[in-house]
Structure formats: structure tokens, C-alpha cells
Amino acid sequence: MRITRDGRRLFVSMNMAGKVVMFNTSDPAKPKLIKVLDLGKDSGPHYLALTKDEKRLVITDYFLNEDDQGKVHAEGDHKIHVAKVSKNDLVLDTKFNLDFNVALGDGPARPHGVAFK
């Protein structure tokens, strides 16, 4: 979950649904849904980070869902997604495509967090 510095926009990852939701939180007592961004089949958005200028939302797509015996039922698509953020919209940036299933050449990596310099 991430919120803008002014507190007017809230972003929530819906892990098992494969979606990121954007709310208008200008009135925190009555948040309004702005956008539901569907990341597609087998996605599992987990960690969200806003760039410093708050124009992009970086989404790590790895959410591990295990049962009591350790069997994995869902773990996301191992990608990093970037969405363009505006006042009233959240749009996937199709120019950005970092797929950790193939990026390292020896199998899937599991992106978990994000750090900006």
C-alpha cells in the first residue's frame, strides 16, 4: 500500500486478484475508487513504490501463497510493472517490461522490494 505525500491518492495491491486499486482519499472518511488496474492472469502484485515525483508507480509482482505443507498455490508472474500515475488515472507503461522469469537466464527470480536512488 502507498499513499501520495499530500494524502489524496491511495494505491493498494490486491495480491490474489492480480490488481492494483487507486483511490481518491481527499476525504479520508469517504475514499472514492478511481481505477482498478488489472495486471493479468497469474499476476500477484505485492510491493508498491511511488517515484519521487509521484508520476510512476512501481509494482513488484511476486506474492507467495503456500499451504501448511509448503505447497505453492500462487506466486505471481515474477515481473516488475510500472504504471503511469495521473490525478484521475493509472495506466500500465507498456514500454517497461522487466520479466524475472527470463532476465537472469537461470530461472525465475522473485522480485520483492524496490529501492530508488
What residue spans do the PLM features occupy?
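Short coil/turn segments that connect the beta-strands within blades of beta-propeller domains
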Residues: 6-8, 53-55
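Short loop/turn segments immediately following beta-strands, especially the blade-tip
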Residues: 22-31, 82-93
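Surface loop/turn motifs at the tips and blade-to-blade linkers of beta-strand repeat domains
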Residues: 36-41, 95-99, 105
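Conserved beta-strand position repeated once per blade in WD40 beta-propeller domains
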Residues: 47, 111-113
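Short, conserved, GDST-rich strand-edge loop motifs in beta-rich repeat architectures
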Residues: 60-80
